[in-house]
Amino acid sequence: MDGSPRVARVALVLHPRNDVTEVAERVVGLANAQGVEVLVRALDAGRVPGAVPVGSDELAAEADGVVSLGGDGTMLGALRLVADKPVPVLGVHLGNLGFLVEVHPSELDSALARLLDGDFVEEPHSALRITAGERRAVAFNDLALARHPGRGTVDATLAVSGLRYGYYRCDALVVATAAGSSAYSYAAGGPLVSPSVGGIVVTPSAPMSGISRPLVLSEADTLQLELNPRCGALALEADGIGHGEVGPGDRVEIAVQAAAGRVVRLDPDVHAQRSRVKLSLLDLPLLPEQLRELLPGEVRERLEARSG
């Protein structure tokens, strides 16, 4: 492993709706037994007895590591929370199909012990830093500009590092990181880009004129989107979170922050294998042995014992 520093204070980030109390209490008990303080956002204080409630800014500033309890959406929220001061983030899988989360609840005890001991590999993730007037947003997957029904379309001119590239007229425009290329961008017809390659993917959805194919640009590039006079009112979303509207005359700027996220990997080879299988869910069918790989470890063991 990479010999990361020990974690002395860990933050818990919880799925916003699902009941994760049982697993959260296990984290608190295991961490406290090793003399490690557990922080939680004040809005979640009632869900985690024994954790220290703090404001979001304090949590991001004080934590040496984060444990995310949920799916990929919760994991993305945890990464955004500490993007200004990146610390290792461990994802515990309590949601739906996910590419970022790695650990199942049955593996929590050993996974948390390794996190606290610094016995893990870090997987760096780039983020998009988005500016639209006075608004600021961070996205680890993607930025989307989407039309409202009956209120016009996306009509925007793209400049790359200050040089005009072309224009878009479409229903939605998605700017994705390489890691986020398997999400909204892929659904809109964009390519899958390996995070090890890096890059920014710009994909129009339902293009009518202008640039009609996806673009793959360098992470060193900065993007400027000028919304033209014929542009409709658009929803601005970062990782699926709404950040209000933009419209004609507005300018949206996007730059990449490299290594803005530090994702904990305990067994990178196994995670990569599972991720490849999960990607195949986007284009069914799956082989039975591939479906078996997606099951939690304890379920696979029971199935193998029965078949043996």
Predicted regions and their residues:
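Short glycine/serine/threonine-rich phosphate/pyrophosphate-binding segments
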Residues: V20-V23, G73-L79, A127, S182-Y186
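A residue-level signal for conserved active-site and pocket-lining positions in enzyme catalytic cores
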Residues: H15, V67, G71, H93, ...
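Gly/Ser/Thr-rich active-site loops/lids in small-molecule metabolic enzymes
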Residues: T153, L163, Y167-I211
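ATP/nucleoside-binding phosphotransfer catalytic cores, i.e., glycine-rich phosphate-binding loops
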Residues: A137, L145, S161-R164, R213-G308
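Catalytic core of DAGKc-family lipid kinases
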Residues: G95-A172
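Short, solvent-exposed amphipathic alpha-helical segments in soluble enzyme
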Residues: R26-A31, A83-D84, G189-V193, E219, ...
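ATP/NTP phosphate-donor binding region
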Residues: M1-G65, L69, S106-V121, A132-R136
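Proline-centered loop/turn at the N-terminus of a beta-strand
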Residues: E37, P86-P88
